[in-house]
């Protein structure tokens, strides 16, 4: 849903091409798309990737919500140039300077994280992942750790704390403490805790950042922790 603010930030750069790659089709990950203002700019190139998840399911979720009943503007009224990349999407991204690897996440309904390499920088975007779920795992912790080994940035789901359990065990999200251990074990450079529980206040989040920083310092880790907030920018 943060894509709305991103749209406002780049609306004055019509030359930028946009690549839309979605992790999964749960509401909180698709609802912002109709409010993404660049899609209302005539001739703005927008590349959509329907086959990186279940074929056409995520694309349908993005587009079908703009049906006139749930949103007043329908897809045929959108003036930007949608390019639905259905053939060799990974090769298409490679030709545009992005090496992208799909990584299965542990999440109800299935989801994918993405490991993106641009030049010599590695960014792992692992949202909606339950590190230790009660259901069958799509990825084991050792494999997850290797996927983000030495990443410049790891952005990882960190919605819960120990007091949320056992009620929310199996809901598809990780404990903050688990993410701290993952970042340390993988020796990532920057660790961004993401997907905060909406019930947590800014003070709560600041307190969790202080705890995570203390744990990493006590274990002599060089990982730099951040708790994501709107407008956060990291320069590599």
Where are these predicted regions, by residue range?
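Thr-Gly-centered strand-to-loop micro-motif
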Residues: 126-127, 156
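A broadly conserved detector of short glycine/acidic/proline-rich loop/turn motifs that flank catalytic sites
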Residues: 129, 160, 231
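Cap/insert and terminal regions of metallo-dependent hydrolase folds
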Residues: 133-224
């Amino acid at each position: 849903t943060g894509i709305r603010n991103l749209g406002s930030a780049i609306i004055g750069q019509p030359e930028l091409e946009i690549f839309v790659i979605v992790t999964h089709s749960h509401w909180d990950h698709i609802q912002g798309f109709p409010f993404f203002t660049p899609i209302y700019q005539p001739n703005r190139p927008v590349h959509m990737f329907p086959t990186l998840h279940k074929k056409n399911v995520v694309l349908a979720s993005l587009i079908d919500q703009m049906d006139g009943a749930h949103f007043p503007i329908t897809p045929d009224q959108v003036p930007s140039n949608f390019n639905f990349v259905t053939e060799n999407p990974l090769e298409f991204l490679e030709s545009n300077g992005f090496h992208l690897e799909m990584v299965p996440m542990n999440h109800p309904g299935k989801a994918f994280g993405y490991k993106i390499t641009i030049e010599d920088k590695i960014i792992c975007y692992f949202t909606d992942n339950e590190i230790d779920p009660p259901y069958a795992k799509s990825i084991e912790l050792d494999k997850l750790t290797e996927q983000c080994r030495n990443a410049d940035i790891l952005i990882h789901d960190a919605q819960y704390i120990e007091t949320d359990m056992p009620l929310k065990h199996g809901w598809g999200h990780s404990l903050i403490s688990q993410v701290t251990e993952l970042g340390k074990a993988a020796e990532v450079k920057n660790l961004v805790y993401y997907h905060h529980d909406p019930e947590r206040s800014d003070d709560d989040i600041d307190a969790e950042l202080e705890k995570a920083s203390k744990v990493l310092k006590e274990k002599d880790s060089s990982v730099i922790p951040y708790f994501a907030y709107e407008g956060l920018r990291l320069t590599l």
